[in-house]
Amino acid sequence: MGTVAFDAIETPFGKTDKIVGGAGTFAALSASFLYDQVKLVGVIGEDFGDDNLNIITSKGVDVEGIQIIEGGKSFFWAGKYHNDMNSRDTITTELNVLENFDPIIPESYQDCEFLLLGNATPQVQMTTLNRLKNKPKLVVLDTMNFWMDIAMDDLKAVLKHVDVLTINDGEARQLSGEYSLVKAAAVILEMGPKYLIIKKGEHGALLFGEGQIFSAPALPLAEVFDPTGAGDAFAGGFIGYLAKVKTINFTNMKNAVVYGSALASFCVEKFGTERLQTLTQEEIEARLKAFVSLAKFDI
């Protein structure tokens, strides 16, 4: 479940008009490289159009769960990235059809075993989970500082029902009240999740769970064109790998973090979904080998 939207992005490398974006879009496209039964729940306006929807369906993603609101306008976000590509200014946010989004879970989705609750209001995330007749084998939740600012109690209520939380380092500190990420993880894991992933952008990601810690590197990239969908592509790759292997343990979680990191590293190479549209399995395999060699050493 996640947003399917239009973005307009400006970075030091260029700018775009309205292009396809949204957390649900990036996550679904990313997951589709690892798992062949990706199903997407979201909402779009009539303005989205078949050509844009085809970007998603061309990768085999099931869009029965996407509501198309007649006469409605799709969610739109415009932002400008600073030179460091880590900080950005939001220029425009138009919720449009997202404002009254009430997720519908089609009958064909009811056997879902692996659920990603993409970045959305905690109420929508909880509603999505409640509308599945059986609790999935694994529930992954992505959120952001905005919801911590305005809906912390609702967010904490959802956290009691999820298995994996994925947030960035600033959000981990805000949610826990601890500066040390190790201490922050201990506090957050008491809130409900069995595993926690803390994304650190160009510095990789940390995985906490089962009393263990894993640090995944980030691949140093010569050029980063657009980091907008990176976190969502990471989440999609992460859950896509776990859906493929089906067994949940710390070893598979570690591999899933690396797969997620690999997919995210492709996503940032072009604007929007452009790179994920042309990506091949051979490129993914080569990138995974690069990740392994990056952190492999003998003592």
Enumerate the language-model features and the residues they cover:
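A short acidic, amphipathic alpha-helical/loop segment
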Residues: N52, V124-R131, D153-A157
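Alpha-helix C-terminal capping segments
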Residues: A28-Q37, Y241-A243
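Conserved N-terminal subdomain of the carbohydrate kinase-like
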Residues: F6-K18, F33-L116, N130-K135, E285-I299
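Conserved phosphate-binding/catalytic region of the ribokinase-like
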Residues: L181-I299
